[in-house]
Swiss-Prot record:
Protein name in UniProt: Cytochrome b
Origin species: Arctogalidia trivirgata (Small-toothed palm civet)
A GO BP entry: mitochondrial electron transport, ubiquinol to cytochrome c
Signal sequence segment: none
Oligomer status and interactors: The cytochrome bc1 complex contains 11 subunits: 3 respiratory subunits (MT-CYB, CYC1 and UQCRFS1), 2 core proteins (UQCRC1 and UQCRC2) and 6 low-molecular weight proteins (UQCRH/QCR6, UQCRB/QCR7, UQCRQ/QCR8, UQCR10/QCR9, UQCR11/QCR10 and a cleavage product of UQCRFS1). This cytochrome bc1 complex then forms a dimer.
Alphabetical keyword list: Electron transport, Heme, Iron, Membrane, Metal-binding, Mitochondrion, Mitochondrion inner membrane, Respiratory chain, Transmembrane, Transmembrane helix, Transport, Ubiquinone
Gene Ontology MF terms in the entry: metal ion binding; ubiquinol-cytochrome-c reductase activity
Chief location bin: mitochondrion
Note: Heme 1 (or BL or b562) is low-potential and absorbs at about 562 nm, and heme 2 (or BH or b566) is high-potential and absorbs at about 566 nm.
PANTHER family: CYTOCHROME B
Residues at which a ubiquinone binds: H201
Binding site for heme b b566: H97, H196
């Protein structure tokens, strides 16, 4: 009798990826976030699909269609809030996943890391376009402000912005194309995630010690399957707590006002998960400089492997680097807070200092601390 999991072309791929996959025996709960991101993506695609059945991407009816989903569609309110808060859970898992990769030196898997950065950019683009769709005040003004940043590009900037808008302002054409892209991008993300896993399985998983674990591997199923299911249950519990008890906690009240091009909200700000980058953008007085800093705040992840000066892979046994890592986390929290504050003293100064610290830690302090640690170990 043939062994189907090991002989059937399709089942074999699933078997080698999720069942018989050799995994290090010591990976901690920080390795759960990959599977949680997969669950978040599936959840977002499913809830998004049901929302798309009732949503209309027209400036005159978009806001009303979202209201209709919440009021008239069976369980429409829960689908809508699962989708909106699911995005927040997605980004929480993303930040944890990237942070884990930085802490334990997983960025030495260059292909996996670079596809991960591409995934991060794609998810951010998708989330931004999704935020525009309800066509509330913050949707409209957020879209206007963020797309307008492209006008800082010399020579072609203005033409590029008008090309993206499909006219001379954010209007029906913009909303329609944003809906089209918001619908298609999650499937592109799914394809990229498969490639991400493909490259990861070429090298095998990293582990907290950063040492090779070839001599100590265990099968993914049942050990990590059960561990992942526990993580998934906790994720769903947290999401349901958010959706059922405080669905608007992470949203903006301005988005419950229909979009009005004649009335600007007092503080234009994106969703909470973009606030750190928004704070870096605002901390530079020059428009082009701000846009470059905004892009670099994420793109800097691609430079991290080049700045790895330590002779150890993981930060597990590197106390100086650990202190700097947690300082970076605190700095990102400060930037997130500043991004939601008005542009006035003392927030401007705090934002500028936090932005300088962010780039200093990653570009200067981390490599120097690694060299010092090497010296202490007499390597």
């Amino acid at each position: 009798m043939t062994n189907i999991p090991k002989s059937h072309p399709l089942v074999k791929i699933v078997n080698e990826s999720f069942i018989d996959l050799p995994a290090p025996s010591n990976i901690s709960a920080w390795w759960n976030f990959g599977s949680l991101l997969g669950i978040c993506l599936i959840l977002q695609i499913l809830t998004g699909l049901f929302l798309a059945m009732h949503y209309t991407s027209d400036t005159t009816t978009a806001f009303s269609s979202v209201t209709h989903i919440c009021r008239d569609v069976n369980y429409g309110w829960i689908i809508r809030y699962m989708h909106a808060n699911g995005a927040s859970m997605f980004f929480i898992c993303l930040f944890m996943h990237v942070g884990r990769g930085m802490y334990y030196g997983s960025y030495t898997f260059l292909e996996t890391w670079n596809i991960g950065i591409l995934l991060l950019f794609t998810v951010m683009a998708t989330a931004f376009m999704g935020y525009v769709l309800p066509w509330g005040q913050m949707s409209f003004w957020g879209a206007t402000v963020i797309t307008n940043l492209l006008s800082a590009i010399p020579y072609i900037g203005t033409d590029l912005v008008e090309w993206i808008w499909g006219g001379f302002s954010v209007d029906k054409a913009t909303l329609t194309r944003f809906f089209a892209f918001h619908f298609i991008l999650p499937f592109i993300i799914s394809a990229l995630a498969v490639v991400h896993l493909l490259f990861l399985h070429e090298t095998g998983s990293n582990n907290p010690s950063g040492l090779t674990s070839d001599s100590d591997k265990i099968p993914f199923h049942p050990y990590y399957m059960i561990k992942d299911i526990l993580g998934i249950l906790l994720l769903i519990l947290m999401l349901l707590l958010l959706v059922l008890f405080s669905p608007d906690l992470l949203g903006d009240p301005d988005n419950y006002t229909p979009a009005n091009p004649l009335n600007t909200p007092p503080h234009i700000k994106p969703e909470w998960y973009f606030l750190f980058a928004y704070a870096i953008l605002r901390s530079i007085p020059n428009k082009l400089g701000g846009v470059l800093a905004l892009i670099l705040s994420i793109l800097i992840l691609a430079i991290i492997p080049l700045l790895h000066t330590s002779k150890q892979r993981s930060m597990m046994f590197r106390p100086f680097s650990q202190c700097l890592f947690w300082l970076l986390v605190a700095d990102l929290l400060i930037l997130t807070w500043i991004g939601g504050q008005p542009v006035e003293y003392p927030f401007i100064t705090i934002g500028q200092l936090a932005s300088i610290l962010y780039f200093s830690i990653l570009l200067i302090l981390m490599p120097i601390s690694s060299i010092i640690e090497n010296h202490f170990l007499k390597w």
